[in-house]
Amino acid sequence: MYEFHPYFTNDGSVGLYSTDFNDIYHSATGALTEAYEKFIYPVDFNTFLHKDKIKVLDICYGIGYNSKSFLNFIFENYCRKNFSKKYSLTKRYIDKIHTNNILQLLLGNFIYKNSICNEQIYTDNIFDKISITAIDNDKILSYISPFIKTGVRNFKNVNIDFKYNAIDKFINNKDKISHPKINELINYLIFEKISENSNDFTQNEELNRLINNPTFSQYFDSNIKGIYKSYRYKPYKNNPRRDYLAILHNIYYRYLSKRYKKRLKRYQLQDINFKLKNDDARKVLLEDYNLYNLIFLDAFTPSKCPCLWSYEFFKLLNEHLEGDGLILTYSTSASIRAAMVVAGFEIGNIYNERLNRFTGTVAAKNKNQIKYPLSEYDLGLLKTKAGIFYRDENLNSLNGAINEARKIEVENSNRISSSHYKKYFNQNH
């Protein structure tokens, strides 16, 4: 049975806990906020979007916050702002299905025509040049991604079935972070793309069990769930009443799906190339020959998942990065930064304006792309024992073996410890 341990982070987006890694997938202060601040805001979109092709590699896709934030940011800040106002579009919504509005659904094509513009009038299409390759070895988790809610208000973290001390102070914190949510159209886009390219998405029983579990209902979008159910619908034999209700359900959600499809076409969002790869990222990239403009590296912490933080893995990423591309990650570990440098990257800090401090690392081939270089102290830290990086010579080692090898190397190293280095640096500066 698949283990699923969700909770609400302080910005109203869903965070997850992994029993396998005894770690959280996202910052408890705000899962969606973290995605924006570490993977979206550091990118110069005004320059970036002038490229003929935009290829994004999302490593450890999870429930998709980084890819969805990327698409949502472009959609809200470039597409919708530049969309022609030639036609007046009236928003109209129908109530959830009841017996008193089923005829309106059956006969009311005029609702559909009035609520959606039938013509594509946005001439500068950004989305047809965007390609996203999302990698995660947890297929069920990535299948859940389009169902996940964001921007939930007045939420309560009740019935949490795990204990993780590091987040207790955050999930019980009354101070919430204000942040925009992912537009429902982006979630529907991801739903459609996964459905189109995954053979078992709509018929996966484990996924079906999870999204229909009442315990988790507060975390999932009811509209996406309804559309999903309409894809799975089968008549109930010998039960006309249930069959009738299912038919009503399908009429409503198929209408809703058509409405979403119209909006995708209107903004040309359907032109995005989205590929989901459910496998070991090392294996996927060894068989991949694409060059990427942006790489989001969002694996579990280096000590929990060192196979995706090794020197050899960064060498592999170097081979897959465009000359003016960027790698973005939340990690500021000296061992990770040292591995990046030896792998041929220029590295710098990711500045968090809200917190007024550095909260991540950016790597590039071009030094001119580094806006916030490392300080003298940080550069010196790379030469201490803390800067000894992980090794995975054949890119197929287990995490335990990689950790053990680094532990032995650190123990046998003549390098100064990070604590002694800090003391020495403070005395001389």
Question: Residue locations for each model-derived region?
Answer:
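SAM/dcSAM-binding transferase cores
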Residues: 2-5, 361-429
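Class I SAM-dependent methyltransferase Rossmann-like catalytic core
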Residues: 3-51, 65-77
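Conserved class I S-adenosyl-L-methionine
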Residues: 52-64
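Class I S-adenosyl-L-methionine-dependent methyltransferase module
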Residues: 69-275, 282
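A short acidic, Gly/Pro-enriched loop at the edge of an enzyme's catalytic core
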Residues: 286-294
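A short glycine-rich, Lys/Arg-flanked "PGG" loop and its adjoining helix->strand segment in the class I
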Residues: 308-323
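Conserved beta-strand signature within the Rossmann-like core of class I S-adenosyl-L-methionine
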Residues: 324-331
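Conserved Class I S-adenosyl-L-methionine
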Residues: 337-358
